[in-house]
Amino acid sequence: MTMLSIRRANVNDTSEIETMVAGFVKGHPAEAHPRSSNALRAAFFGEHPVAHLLVAEQGSEIIGMAQWRLVYDMFWGMFGAEAGWLYLKPRFRGSGIVAALVARLCSEASEAGARFLQGGGGEGPSRLYERIAIGQSDRVCHLSGKAFQLFATLDGLPVREIVRRLPLKEFGLQPAD
């Protein structure tokens, strides 16, 4: 199996990102909506990026992506991260790579001061989120407390090890150390 790497996306990845967006949007009402390469580049690689975009690579192929941005929760009085646009090419799904992307996302967000992760999604990522995070009926899930802290430490481990070490959902109710 080719080594997995996760890194920050850069402007040279634009074409691959657009290909993944085209796969991601299939079946959505926006499927036929035109999307501008310039707008994508400005959104993630311009003067004021809207979020941090990560890509997963195996060999020289970009196979997945996820974005995160720093948020502030006024109820809890702390910074967190909001995850979005988590996508993995279909032939790589079920391999634990999504967990590796989320681990890197938690690691980067933690370094930026985040103490929790919130996000949601379709059936695929929601299975992971519902396994490790505390969710509401609106399918927005929060990975927080000790669970968030533990997930951040999984960054860089082999995919199978990340999946084996996934924190218990209940750890999201415990304060981080």
Residue map of PLM features:
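A short beta-loop-alpha structural element at the N-terminal edge
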Residues: 5-19
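A short helix-loop-beta-strand connector motif used in the catalytic cores of GNAT acetyltransferases and
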Residues: 44-55, 82
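Conserved active-site alpha-helix within GNAT-family acetyltransferase domains
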Residues: 115, 122-146, 150
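Conserved acetyl-CoA-binding loop-helix of GNAT-fold acetyltransferases
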Residues: 88, 94-107
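Conserved beta-strand in the GNAT
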Residues: 55, 61-70, 87
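Conserved acetyl-CoA binding element of GNAT-fold acetyltransferases
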Residues: 77-90
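Conserved GNAT-fold acetyl-CoA-binding loop/helix
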Residues: 18-43
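Conserved acyl-donor/pantetheine-binding loop and adjacent beta-alpha core of acyl/acetyltransferases
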Residues: 67, 75-80, 148-151
